[in-house]
Swiss-Prot record:
Family: Belongs to the arginine deiminase family.
Cystine connections: none
GO annotations of cellular component type: cytoplasm
Protein name: Arginine deiminase
Keywords: Arginine metabolism, Cytoplasm, Hydrolase
Designated gene of the protein: arcA
Pathway: Amino-acid degradation; L-arginine degradation via ADI pathway; carbamoyl phosphate from L-arginine: step 1/2
Length: 407
């Protein structure tokens, strides 16, 4: 039987991918809540949905199976006992472990069918929707200026981050910011209780940690090499932790930890660096020094479960050695222009989704970067992006590969 998850590269022909179609959670962003919910702008939902449907169709037209996060979650929660356990944890992680608000939310959500319940949780639950019959101190002292008892999850359409497929398993990630932490709880239940995955996948690292790692920083370069960003959203300690697990229980023996600026514009490694062919990568010039260097550390398994570590700055040489290539082609976002590069990187010009070696999906708005990719022999499928890009994530961010062919 084929493995439920199988991803041994960034570029192997994509067979199955998990998406989330943006829903009403997008319309529950307000100017006052944008910072709290990690948004810089408010997408126009009807157009964002059309753009997302175009993205999904672009993938299915290439023979790729598209499965949806929200549907997988509903199927995982068909059992009443599992659904009740899930709701207890979800409500607790929303700030209500016990009390009348917890009980009112449980009554409100448990009455729904699993699909409606998941959709409502992602959309957010307004205080006005829930009937609190006998108030307690927590309920009467709740911030009346904030309309939600359970915050919306507008970042859910970036399915890359709450988990990362690696080999025949995945990491279920401890997210950095509160706005996204509950997303990976849904992943946990999908993997534990959806028949497609239950009992069939290895979990290299679960979400029950103090240190953070997110899927946008986890790049699977081949069947034994990973690149992981040390970033705003992923800590060095988390990288060492997952390295120990992978070195012990998998074929992975090399992790390249790449240090990038810790800011919102470059929140993950895949916003500035992605693999698009056997020896070709996109790179945002701003992460490199004038002579093309970037701090990176190569981790290998040592004795007795320890990790050996070597510091380097020449990323080309590190990649050539790790991937056994004579040359590495780093293709600069925006052709390296000091104005075009940061503009197109802001709109995810570096965030390419490889669907086969030398074949990528990109946002249409990044035309300078797209033309340069074509000049380097890459086949580019452009997708519409006027509203989706307002969330600060591109095609790689919006997709979680589940199965790829080996390269």
């Amino acid at each position: 039987m084929a493995n439920a998850i199988h991803v041994t590269s960034e570029i192997g022909k994509l067979k199955t991918v998990m998406l989330h179609r943006p829903g009403k959670e997008i319309e529950n962003i307000t100017p006052d809540s944008m910072e709290r919910l990690l948004f810089d702008d408010i997408p126009y939902l009807p157009i964002a949905q059309k753009e997302h449907d175009f993205f999904a169709k672009t993938l299915t037209d290439q023979g790729i199976e598209v499965i949806y996060f929200e549907k997988l979650a509903a199927d995982a929660l068909s059992d009443d006992g599992v659904r009740k356990e899930f709701l207890n944890r979800m409500i607790a992680e929303s700030g209500y472990a016990v009390g009348v608000i917890h009980d009112a939310l449980m009554e409100y959500l448990y009455a729904m069918d699993p699909q409606m319940m998941i959709n409502q949780i992602i959309e957010g639950v307004r205080a006005s929707d829930v009937n609190i019959v006998t108030p307690d101190l927590q309920s009467v002292s709740e911030n009346t200026d904030w309309p939600f008892l359970m915050d919306p999850m507008p970042n859910a359409y970036f399915t890359r981050d709450p988990q990362a497929s690696i080999g025949d398993g995945l990491s279920i990630n401890k997210m950095t910011f509160e706005a996204r932490m509950r997303e990976s709880l849904i992943t946990e239940y999908i993997m534990n209780y959806n028949p497609r995955f239950a009992g069939k996948v290895k979990v290299w690292r679960d979400r029950n940690h103090r240190t953070h790692i997110e899927g946008g920083d986890e790049l699977v370069l081949n069947d034994h090499v990973l690149a992981i960003g040390i970033s705003q959203r992923t800590t060095a300690n988390a990288i060492e932790d997952i390295a120990r697990n992978l070195f012990k229980d998998s074929n992975y023996d090399t992790i390249i930890a790449i240090s990038i600026p810790h800011n919102h514009a470059m929140m993950h490694l895949d916003t500035v660096f992605t693999m698009i062919n056997y020896e070709q990568f996109t790179v945002h010039p701003a992460i490199l020094t004038g002579d093309g260097k970037v701090d990176n550390w190569v981790l290998h398994p040592g004795k007795d479960g320890e990790i050996t570590m070597e510091h380097h700055t020449d990323i080309k040489e590190v990649l050539k050695k790790a991937l056994n290539k004579s040359e590495i082609d780093l293709i600069p976002t925006g052709n390296g222009d000091p104005i075009v590069a940061p503009r197109e990187q802001w709109n995810d010009g570096s965030n390419t989704l490889s669907i086969a070696p030398g074949v990528v999906v990109t946002y249409d708005r990044n035309y300078v970067s797209n033309d340069l990719l074509r000049q380097h022999g890459i086949l580019v499928h452009e997708v519409r992006s006027s509203e989706l890009s307002r969330g600060r994530g591109g095609p790689r961010c919006m997709s979680c590969p589940i199965v790829r062919e080996d390269i």
